[in-house]
């Protein structure tokens, strides 16, 4: 797993209180990991802070899964 994926996974586990084993590429933050809309906003903010990037609102709406987050951040970093 890449450094980006490891860091994203750590943020997801800490913010959503889920087991690391449940955070897989196609795991939906809302459907699979129990996040609500506020959680997803907080995740995006945490990703922005951790990786020193800005995620525009329209892009944030497309980040629905762990894999989406890793892909976006990898391309933006």
Curated annotation (Swiss-Prot):
GO molecular function: acyl binding; acyl carrier activity
Keyword Cytoplasm: yes
An annotated GO cellular component: cytosol
SUPFAM superfamilies in the cross-refs: ACP-like (SSF47336)
Pathway(s) served: Lipid metabolism; fatty acid biosynthesis
Subcellular location: Cytoplasm
Domain Carrier: 2-77
A UniProt-annotated Pfam family: PP-binding
Any GO BP: lipid A biosynthetic process
Superkingdom classification of source: Bacteria
Segments crossing the lipid bilayer: none
Record-listed O-(pantetheine 4'-phosphoryl)serine modification sites: 37
NCBIfam families linked to this entry: acyl_carrier, PRK00982.1-2, PRK00982.1-3, PRK00982.1-4, PRK00982.1-5
UniProt cross-references to HAMAP family, sorted A to Z: Acyl_carrier (MF_01217)
PANTHER family in the cross-refs: ACYL CARRIER PROTEIN (PTHR20863), CARRIER DOMAIN-CONTAINING PROTEIN (PTHR20863:SF76)
Family statement: Belongs to the acyl carrier protein (ACP) family.
Full protein name: Acyl carrier protein
Organism: Dinoroseobacter shibae (strain DSM 16493 / NCIMB 14021 / DFL 12)
